[in-house]
Structures are given as C-alpha cells and as structure tokens.
C-alpha cells in the first residue's frame, strides 16, 4: 500500500487523526496490526 506524499498541513491533520486511532488500539490490542497504517 503506497501513500501519496502529502503537504505539511495535510500530514499534520492526518497525524492528529492517527493518534486517536493509536489510543484506541491500546485499549483493543487485537486491532493493533492495522494500527498506525490505517
């Protein structure tokens, strides 16, 4: 799965989203594999 390079602003936005995903994964270890890469 290749990701398109993003502008800095966009990557910051998605980073915030992804930290939420990570936090959920700590509570739900079975979902870990998808983790940061969602």
UniProtKB/Swiss-Prot annotation:
Residues 1-16 have a biased composition (Basic residues). Keywords: Capsid protein, DNA-binding, Host cytoplasm, Virion. The keyword DNA-binding applies. Residues 1-38 are annotated as: Disordered. GO terms for cellular component: host cell cytoplasm; viral capsid. GO terms for molecular function: DNA binding. It comes from the Viruses. The keyword DNA-binding applies. It is found in: Virion; Host cytoplasm. Its main location: virion. Belongs to the microviridae J protein family. Mediates ssDNA packaging into virion, it locates to the internal surface of the capsid, thereby displacing the internal scaffolding protein VP3 during virion formation. Additionally, protein VP8 plays a role in viral attachment to the host cell. This is DNA binding protein VP8.
């Amino acid at each position: 799965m290749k990701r398109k390079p993003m502008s800095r602003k966009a990557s910051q936005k998605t980073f915030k989203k992804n930290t939420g995903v990570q936090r959920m994964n700590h509570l739900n270890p079975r979902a870990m594999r998808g983790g940061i890469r969602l």
